[in-house]
Every structure is written in C-alpha cells, then in structure tokens.
Amino acid sequence: MALSMKMRANARVSGRRVAAVAPRVVPFSSASSSVLRSGFALRCLWTSAAWAALASVVEAVKKSVGDLHKADLEGKRVFVRADLNVPLDKATLAITDDTRIRAAVPTLKYLLDNGAKVLLTSHLGRPKGGPEDKYRLTPVVARLSELLGKPVTKVDDCIGPEVEKAVGAMKNGELLLLENCRFYKEEEKNEPEFAKKLAANADLYVNDAFGTAHRAHASTEGVTKFLKPSVAGFLLQKELDYLDGAVSNPKRPFVAIVGGSKVSSKITVIEALMEKCDKIIIGGGMIFTFYKARALKVGSSLVEDDKIELAKKLEEMAKAKGVQLLLPTDVVVADKFDANANTQTVPITAIPDGWMGLDIGPDSVKTFNDALADAKTVVWNGPMGVFEFPQVRQRTVSIANTLAGLTPKGCITIIGGGDSVAAVEQAGVAEKMSHISTGGGASLELLEGKVLPGVAALDEK
C-alpha cells in the first residue's frame, strides 16, 4: 500500500478514525482525498483490508491505567466499567464461573493500592428496561471481596442520591460496587443525560470491559465525554495488545481456526484473516456450506444455501492469495439433532441421506494438528462441532489440547469465543494458553479491523 503522511507542527496522532468506512478508492496519481485526524493526513490507494488494518493499529494506541501513578490517583474517584457478566445458577444465583471477576482484579487492585476511591459498575444478563432481582450484581460482592482481600460495599443503584451519599462517605483505597447499569434503558441507548449522571460522582474513567467495547453504550462510550482522563484498564489493554498484535504483526506461520455454525456470521473475519494468515482451518456447521459448494452430498446437515456462492468465492480467494484453507476430511454424523442420537464417523464424501454432521472426525484432527505443528501464532474462534452435546465435543477439546502443547514451544495461542473458551477450560489447559479473550463479539470485530466504540472513545497516549 503506497502511503504518504504529513503532520502539522505540534500536532499529535489521534487514535480515532473519522468514519467507520474506508475512503473511496481512487488512482494513486490523483489521490487527493485524505483522512484528517488531528492534523494527521493519509493519502494512499486504499483497499478495505488496508483501511481495516490501519484503523486497528492506530486504535490500539491508547492511554492505560498503568500510565497513571499515585499522584494521579490518590483521593480521586475513579469510575470503572468492568465486565462482571458472570454465569449464575438459575436456582441459587450462585456464580458458576468467576473468570470475568478474576480478570478485573489487576486493574481494581492497582487503583486501590494507589489510594483511589473506586466506583465499579457492570451489566449482568439482559434485564428488560428495569430492575430484576435475578440480574442484580449482589452475587459478585462476596467473591470480589475475597479476591481483593478487602470489604466491598454495594448500593442498589448506579446513579442518583443513594450513590452520591455512599461516594461521599468513601475513604481512599475503598471500592463501591454500583448496581447493574442496564437496569436503565438509557444505558444501551447511550443517552447523554444518563451518561452524565453516571459520571457525576467521579473524577476520571477506566474502561476494563473488553466484552462490551464493541458497543457504544453510556457506560462504555458516553461517560468519556464527561470524565478526563478516560483510559483503558489492564485487561482491555491486554486484549488489544494480543488481538491487534496477532493481526497487525504476527509471528509466522500464522494460523487461524474459525468454527461456528454459519458462514454468514464469520464471513467478515475470514476475509480479514485472509489478508494476514498463512493457513485458515474451518470447522463447525459452516463446513457443510463449503461442501455443498463443492457439489458434495451433505445429508440433512446445516447449509446456508444463499451463501454457497460466497463459500466458492472464499476458496478462490484463498487460492489466489496463497493461503492454505483447510476443511475437515471426515465428520461425525447423527440420525437426528439430539444429544442421544445414533452417530457414526464417515468421510466427507460419504455422508448418508437423512444424517447430519455434528462434529469433525479423528482424521480431521490429525490433518489439523499437522497444519498447526509449525505455527508461531494461532487465533481460535468458534467450536469444531455442536459443543453443547457431550458426545460430540471431544474434537473441539482435542484442538484445545493441541494448542496447549504449542504454547511452550514459543507459539502465541489466542482463544476468543465462548465455546472455544469453554473447551480450553474443560480440557484443563486454560493456563497453558497465551491469552484467553473475555469478549466474543468484541474480539471478532477487532480481528475484522472494525473500530470498537468503547476503545475509540479513550484518550490517546
């Protein structure tokens, strides 16, 4: 990509992008259009992929909480947006997985150890425009207190006089947990007045909720207009470093593993990864759309008929770019979509009529393991099969074990996506991965090169 840059004197590079779309493509000789960002002018022959890659790199250079020191934090009221959306037992409301709480601890401890008064909020579940007891953050209090080694006080609101009174009574180094911010419909609508109320009792802002960074909500984007500085927490910064680093400057060979049920939900990320990857491994239900595009019989397997031409295009694109696109060579099929269905393993050329594919087979695992053997960077998003069925989740777990073996050999292994994370947890190898992303949708959008509103709104270094 040809690129020329010029900057005004005393101007600094901004991490924000003017628009979420690429400039129009023009011949370089007449490329007079430029994208201005605080005096930073870009002039080039653009492609959508080049634009996405540049946007992703620029966006990631944000001020972090680690750039703030005791003098900046002591006595200050810090509004922290974390992702405490933990799974709860439906009957007891007990936390069944505290991963997201543990992930928030480094940022919170840093702030508390430096004398800040921490106001912490999050969303939990999907409340329907008002308070619901099953979505209160109350279950978080005991576990968070245990992890921090100090008492955690909670109020039953996130704005208003109750919060103001509680904040007024806080001492340095104390934490106040505010209630679920999605109890107000204004949160997801990013209404300025609500954002102003969230910010009313704070002096500065820290966003450590990568899982919602792709949403422009009041607590992730709106509050930054009222609180300065607005910086990234350690978790958010780690996510950006790993995920953006994997795409913008990967150690090679770079392999992406993309699973899931539908081509339509992963098309953008597959296209973006083709610009960077040496190999792409495809798994999950989407493989049957590729098979049908090859004129193979797929039985009753899930197929997106309107995406068959797209599957052909992706295979052609991979060939043109010299990217090795690997599909399973055998599959586990069932006579019905049920956890207790009859199953058998067959080559992809021999799927019986009336049977549907639910997982990849053992030969496929061997093929994929061979492709991964020399990898130096691996990004994995999405399961290899129907992970919720215990009898057909073993291949996904096998891939998790393979990646765990690569990490000690110097390979950077990055896991993003709910079922991929569940697989490494179930295999007991989570600690052996380089990075496990806390945001499924956010990690996908970052890999696609999209601007994350919650990140773009933060202060640049």
Curated annotation (Swiss-Prot):
Residues reported in the UniProt entry to bind CDP: 260, 284, 382, 387
Positions bound to AMP: 262, 266, 285, 357, 388
Keywords: ATP-binding, Calvin cycle, Chloroplast, Kinase, Magnesium, Metal-binding, Nucleotide-binding, Plastid, Transferase, Transit peptide
Catalytic activity: (2R)-3-phosphoglycerate + ATP = (2R)-3-phospho-glyceroyl phosphate + ADP
InterPro entries the UniProt entry points to: Phosphoglycerate_kinase, Phosphoglycerate_kinase_CS, Phosphoglycerate_kinase_N, Phosphoglycerate_kinase_sf
Principal subcellular localisation of the protein: plastid
Annotated Pfam families: PGK (PF00162)
Subunit and partners: Monomer.
Protein name: Phosphoglycerate kinase, chloroplastic
Species classification: Eukaryota, Viridiplantae, Chlorophyta, core chlorophytes, Chlorophyceae
